[in-house]
């Protein structure tokens, strides 16, 4: 078979040259659009469901929330296994699907199953939430917010309400999760003595706040040919709105929240903390969406963070160098480029030292980009992107390619030289054919082994 391929190539040299040029152009075009990541996707498609039930014990969360969800999703088509974990006030269920399952279809199927068990959850349970689709190695960038003059609550507010929305608007970003700092919240500190004096309970205050914290739609008011929308504005926007909420009327006298409680801004109870070294800070983790290109998304995130930095107060420091996944990819690409350059130099030096012929060196050098782009086309055909493992494999393979090219070119060069010294020289094509066929099987088999 190898002899027939060599013979056909020698008889159709122009076609082979044109095909090689087209092959190189196609490989370069495909290379530009291939996704780049640190590692290939090594985890099967999965859907993560989290359900919050404030105050619920782990045993109750497992029995009343986790188990019903597990039972509902177990029969979903394509499910390989279901894992779960229950903690204080939180249920987490991980539904793992078979390889090849479309993750978006899987999410739709799981969502339909969840709806059938929502009514069975205990009162006060939040609606189940499916976490965003992220890659198995989805951490793109980690940033931190620090300040010598501002409180951790202010830093967390900046992260949650200024940085996070702008980053989520970028294509390829799946989630932005901040840890550390203090989450700002309205706190109503009830006084048992004042509650008893007005014969009220904590539930009365809670219900009053829930009723008042809404904007009520009204009708239309028509006047002078114009329609005006009537809306009851009750949404809480300040501490005074909370203080002035009416809890109850006693003898036609309103009892306000301020009469039975102290109202202030405070920090949510912490579940963990964040720091850079030993300095408290707000640390944000940006994760990329499933299938997104790591380098492209990272560059967009860095541009956005640079723009955000200009809008932050001067006493707030935004550090975007805590972690950068793209560094690993860029390092792998740099190593591959270095391997290409070193391989080309070694081939050139070896061939010039032993053969002293420019044409042989050029032919061997051409084999490097041709083989490399051939590998890129093969990866693309199998749906595999560029990552540290494929780049490492290509870098190692370059050595084999160069070795094979040197052996072939050296043997052809030697046979041509002997043919020129012969009293009855044979046709050049026949000499090249015999020289290449002579070592072809050995080279191919040795390369495969």
Regions found by a protein language model. Give the residues of each.
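Internal alpha-helical transmembrane segments of multi-pass membrane proteins, especially GPCRs
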Residues: 10-14, 333, 337, 341, ...
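Membrane-proximal extracytoplasmic
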Residues: 1-345, 353, 386
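Helix-terminus/capping and membrane-interface signal
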Residues: 205, 334, 358-361, 387, ...
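Hydrophobic transmembrane alpha-helices and their membrane-interface caps
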Residues: 27-31, 317-318, 345-414
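Hydrophobic alpha-helical segments of membrane proteins
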Residues: 344, 348, 443-448
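The H+8 position on the N-terminal DHp helix of two-component sensor histidine kinases
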Residues: 16, 85, 222, 364, ...
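Helix-loop junctions and hydrophobic alpha-helical segments within the transmembrane domains
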Residues: 329, 333-334, 409, 415-445
């Amino acid at each position: 078979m190898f002899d027939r391929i060599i013979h056909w190539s020698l008889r159709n040299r122009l076609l082979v040259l044109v095909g090689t040029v087209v092959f190189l152009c196609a490989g370069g075009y495909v290379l530009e659009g291939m996704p780049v990541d640190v590692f290939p996707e090594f985890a099967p498609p999965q859907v993560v469901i989290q359900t919050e039930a404030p105050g619920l014990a782990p045993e109750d969360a497992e029995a009343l929330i986790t188990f019903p969800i597990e039972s509902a999703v177990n029969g979903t088509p394509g499910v390989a296994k279901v894992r779960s974990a229950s903690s204080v006030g939180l249920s987490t269920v991980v539904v793992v699907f078979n390889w090849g399952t479309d993750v978006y279809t899987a999410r739709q199927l799981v969502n339909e199953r969840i709806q059938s068990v929502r009514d069975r959850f205990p009162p006060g349970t939040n609606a189940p939430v499916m976490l965003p689709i992220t890659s198995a190695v989805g951490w793109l960038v980690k940033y931190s917010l620090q300040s010598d003059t501002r409180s951790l609550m202010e830093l967390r507010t900046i992260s949650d309400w200024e940085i996070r929305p702008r980053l989520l608007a970028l294509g390829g970003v799946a989630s932005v999760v901040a840890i550390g700092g203090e989450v700002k919240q309205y706190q109503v500190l009830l006084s048992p003595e004042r509650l008893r004096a007005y014969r009220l309970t904590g539930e009365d205050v809670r219900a009053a706040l829930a009723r008042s914290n809404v904007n009520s739609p009204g009708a239309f008011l028509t006047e002078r040919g114009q329609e005006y929308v009537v809306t009851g504005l009750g949404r809480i926007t300040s501490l005074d709105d909370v203080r002035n909420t009416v809890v109850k009327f006693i003898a036609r006298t309103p009892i306000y929240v301020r009469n039975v409680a102290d109202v202030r801004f405070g920090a949510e109870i912490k579940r963990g903390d964040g720091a850079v070294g030993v300095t408290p800070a707000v640390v944000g983790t940006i994760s990329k969406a499933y299938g997104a290109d790591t380098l492209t998304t990272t560059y967009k995130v860095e541009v956005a963070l640079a723009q955000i930095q200009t809008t932050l107060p001067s006493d707030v420091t935004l550090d975007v160098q805590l972690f950068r996944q793209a560094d690993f990819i860029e390092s792998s690409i740099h190593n591959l480029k270095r391997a290409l350059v070193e391989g080309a130099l070694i081939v050139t030096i070896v061939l010039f030292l032993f053969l002293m012929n420019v044409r042989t060196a050029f032919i061997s050098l051409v084999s490097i980009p041709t083989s490399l782009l051939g590998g890129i086309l093969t990866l693309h055909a199998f749906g595999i992107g560029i990552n540290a493992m494929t780049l490492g494999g290509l870098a190692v393979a370059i050595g084999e390619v160069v070795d094979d090219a040197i052996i072939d070119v050296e043997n052809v060069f030697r046979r041509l030289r002997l043919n020129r010294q012969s009293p009855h020289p044979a046709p050049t094509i026949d000499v090249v054919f015999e020289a290449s066929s002579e070592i072809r099987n050995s080279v191919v088999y040795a390369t495969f082994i």
